[in-house]
Amino acid sequence: SSIFILSVSTSVYTADSDIYLTQTGTGLTLAIDQVGASNKIGTSQARVILSGTSMTVDLDQLGDTNVLAASISQGNSSSWTYKVTGDSSNATFAVGGTGDVAGSDFDFEATGDSTVLVFNQGDAATSTSGDQDFVVTGASNNINVKCNVIGCKNEWAVSGNSNDIDT
């Protein structure tokens, strides 16, 4: 797993890079920075899939029209950070769709205009707890958050005009 992550890290600093990843196991530490426009980390047809406990995942996309699509099937005691800087990016997260995400923490930060986030947590009957922080700065952003877990906590900081927040 470490060798794969290292090879990804050397190639993510150019525009139009596509990353597809499937990881299962305990203790994953993953950091990806994509700089440039039209980058992808997964797609709606081929999502990144993460499953395990004690994962630390930090994904940053800097530039316009970037895409991220991830399924985090199970992730107890895990921490995810997603930062997007630029306009017209699109991110989709399905968290806890098939397992527990107890003690999980998700931080989302968007700076720019016309960003779309779809975040669904806890569709599995076994999903519990969740702590989400959403920071949105810019105009015309569309944030859709659904949390179906016991003990879900969402915190918001939103600034800018014409932002659409649905929970």
What is each PLM-predicted segment?
Residues 1-167:
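Long, low-complexity, polar and repeat-rich extracellular regions
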